[in-house]
Amino acid sequence: VLEACKQLEKEGFEVTYLKVDAHGLVNFADLLHYIKCDTILISIMTANNEIGTIQHMQAIAETAKEKGIIFHTDAVQAVGSISFNVDAMGIDAMSISSHKIYGPKGAGCLFVRDGVKIQSIISGGKQERGIRGGTQNVPAIVGFGKAIEVAVRDMSINNKKIKSLKEYFVKRLTESIDDIYI
C-alpha cells in the first residue's frame, strides 16, 4: 500500500501517513484529526506481520462510512491468521495475496464492495468487471482458492501452535534475561 500511496502523491493526490503507537495501533484521535472534507480513502493494514498488531477495523470502518469515505484494508498479513467478515466489519475494499498463505506467487484478490467505483488498472478488456484487461491466470486462481481453503481449515490449529511457541519463547527470555520488557 505504501508504494501505491507514493504513486498517488506523484499523480497529485495529498496522502497523509498516520503514526502508530508503541503497540502498532493507529491512533484513532489522529485519524479523526486528519480526515478532511475532501478525504476520499482511508487505507489501513489489517495486521502487522512484524509485531502482530491487529487494528480496530470496525471502528475505523464505521468512521469512514459516517464521513462518506471509502475504507480499504490491506489484509495480506491477516488472511489465514484471523477471522474477519467484510460485511460485519464494514470494509469497502480489501486486498489479499496468495503467496502469504503458501499459494501461487502472482495471484491476489481485491474485494470491492458493490457501489464502490474504482478505475481500471490495466486497460484492454472487460475482465474483472472492466477493472483489469487480459487473460486471467486460471491455475494460479485455483491454487489461491485451495490455499485459502487450507488456511481457513487449519487456522485454529496453526494459531494454537503459534501461541504455544510464543509462550515458550517469552518464558525462556524472561528466565534468561534480567529486567527484560516484552
Residue ranges and their predicted role:
Residues 1-182:
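Pyridoxal 5′-phosphate
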